[in-house]
């Protein structure tokens, strides 16, 4: 779906699009990811109910799963100005502003890419830009099962600790609550007027549309 939307955004057939979702348990390896960064065998992965996918974003290996807000902004940077670095920094600021709504003090300066609470990573970012249009995006730990990170060398950093909004606050936070806080900040940071559509509306426009070569 991402690839098809990216083609349509690049061709001016679709407006910039933001996909927000939760994944089932999955480990994804970016272009710099290594199979050795996954520390368990296939039998253990099956017990965990987790799949492994090699994808074309930047970065190494990370985990996605229930309780995590994953966002795929598919944006034409050529229309909005700024390159990939500015885009990533704007994503970081958007996530930091979102976390501040809940009283979580986060930062990104002088750190590896992503968003951090002290020495603990709370959000990961991995993107790709093709024909000036972004794909992939970010993953914000709202209230996932953080033990899934124990089975990988997350983001290529063996000693990195992960955290979540719920762990930092000491109570449950829902992904829906995180989305409600994130959307206004995303619109403000990127200068968008946002309109929400149901997933079926996005899918129905893609069903019979041939993918451009």
Language-model features, listed with the residues they occupy:
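Residues at secondary-structure transition points
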Residues: 36-39, 71, 132, 143, ...
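Catalytic-loop motifs flanking and including active-site residues across diverse enzymes
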Residues: 67, 134, 178
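C-terminal accessory segment of soluble enzyme catalytic cores
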Residues: 147-213
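Catalytic cores of processing enzymes, dominated by hydrolases/peptidases
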Residues: 117-163, 167-170
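Short, charged/polar low-complexity linear motifs in solvent-exposed/disordered segments
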Residues: 45-46, 88-90, 141-142, 167, ...
């Amino acid at each position: 779906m991402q690839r098809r939307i990216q083609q349509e955004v690049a061709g001016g057939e679709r407006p910039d699009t933001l996909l927000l979702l939760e994944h089932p348990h999955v480990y994804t390896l970016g272009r710099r990811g290594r199979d050795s960064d996954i520390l368990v065998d296939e039998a253990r992965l099956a017990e965990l109910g987790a799949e492994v996918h090699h994808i074309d974003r930047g970065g190494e290996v990370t985990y996605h799963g229930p309780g995590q807000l994953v966002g795929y902004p598919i944006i034409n940077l050529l229309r909005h100005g700024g390159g990939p670095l500015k885009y990533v920094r704007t994503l970081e600021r958007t996530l930091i502003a979102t976390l501040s709504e809940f009283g979580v003090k986060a930062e990104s300066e002088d750190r590896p890419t992503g968003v951090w609470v002290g020495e603990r990573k709370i959000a990961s970012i991995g993107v790709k830009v093709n024909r000036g249009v972004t794909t992939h995006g970010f993953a914000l730990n709202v209230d996932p099962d953080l033990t899934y990170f124990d089975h990988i060398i997350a983001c290529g950093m063996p000693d990195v600790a992960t955290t979540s909004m719920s762990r930092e606050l000491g109570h449950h936070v829902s992904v829906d609550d995180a989305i409600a806080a994130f959307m206004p900040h995303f619109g403000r940071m990127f200068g968008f007027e946002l309109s929400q559509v149901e997933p079926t509306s996005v899918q129905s426009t893609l069903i019979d549309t041939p993918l451009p070569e």
